[in-house]
Amino acid sequence: MRRALASVLATVFALSAAAANAAEIKVISAGAVRALIAGMIDDYSKQTGHKFDFTTGPTGFLRGVIATGQHADLIIASAPLMGELEKTGKLTTGSRNDLGRVGMGVVIREGAPVPDVSTPEAIKQLLLKASSIAYTDPKLGGTTVLHLMKLADRFGITDAVVKKGVLATGGDDASEKVAHGQAEIAVSLISEIVPIKGAKMAGPLPGDTQLWTIYASAIPMSSKEPAHARAFIAALTSPAMAPRWSTGGFEQVK
């Protein structure tokens, strides 16, 4: 994979002379892609000498950071949030790139019995029987907790889910809490389950309980390093990187 990235970088350098000089690139990103982007940043930095200021968090956190006018060279966020930013003129026209889509899954501790998650009714019963459920603090406005609460409302079990709640700072933290035995189960984005040691996906949410979220990158109007940001995104979205996205839980946007 590192050889593939090196090959991609050769093309990037040919397309962008600006990428030849070391720079500091500030990236504000959704937690759903944290593990993937962190690994790619590490490889890219070693190859180019560029430094990165990498900040991640749930959707509500990102919305707040951007609303304060904080500088960023690159934003990676869910499609709905990108839509909001486009409407308010905060993004450079034509800079948006859809990176992939990711679904949600049920998290259990590695080695624990795998529960039935094959039908909506099975999900309802699992939520009712679980002793504790980890999820992002609703005040942070994360994608997963908003969907989980919609499902709980649909099943008529909101009070039960809330009482069992173990609050986390994000989907990956919810998966961590399950891995460390602080909660029996969690419902997280698949990309926030795969990289967590000690956590295992019992299965994806079934049928109409599933929520697919597209994540995209874009260059904000406040970017001080737009050329370097474009070069980095060119590397991330190259065909050579497709296996890395797939392994990380993402599917191509159709």
Tell where the protein language model's regions lie, with residue ranges.
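Positively charged n-region of N-terminal signal peptides that target proteins for export
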Residues: M1-A4
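Bacterial N-terminal signal peptides
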Residues: A6-S16
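Sec/Tat signal peptide C-region and signal peptidase I cleavage site
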Residues: S16-A22
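Exported/periplasmic ABC-transporter solute-binding proteins
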Residues: A23-T68, A79-G89, S95-V102, I108-K254
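Periplasmic-binding protein-like
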Residues: D73-I76
